Amino acid sequence: MNEIRWRVLHQLRNFFIAQGANFCFVGAEFPLPLVGRDATIDLLFMHRGLNCLLAIDLHLGTRQPDIQKSHDEYLAIIDREVKKTHENPTIGVLLCADKSEEIVEYSLERSLSPAQVAGYHKYLPTQKALQEKLHELYLRYIAVTEVLD
């Protein structure tokens, strides 16, 4: 992982930890048990209040069309292989940033009722807050990249 990406992930980790004591950091570049290839989730947290894992997948640069499919596959692996039986389904956060936009997508709906999804949102940073943070970090990322080029 390049140093700039690592710095962005470090700042995102700090952002989530600053959201309160419910966010417990589990790991960065957390390895996922996939047969035949190496795979990692960028940041993994445990949310104590929601009793679930929060998996953050960061993509800087041009968004690839299969990102959502890979993200969903990773969430299924985490639910099957990493989460404990007493924990709720994993929440996924897909963060994509390029020169034109920042995209923040929560993956909550896989096995939750609409009422549960609404309840979860009050414990998580808003999409707008995450977009603003991602925009700030991406601008910093672009500035550093341009200086290094």
Predicted regions and their residues:
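Charged, terminal alpha-helix-loop-beta segments
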Residues: 1-149
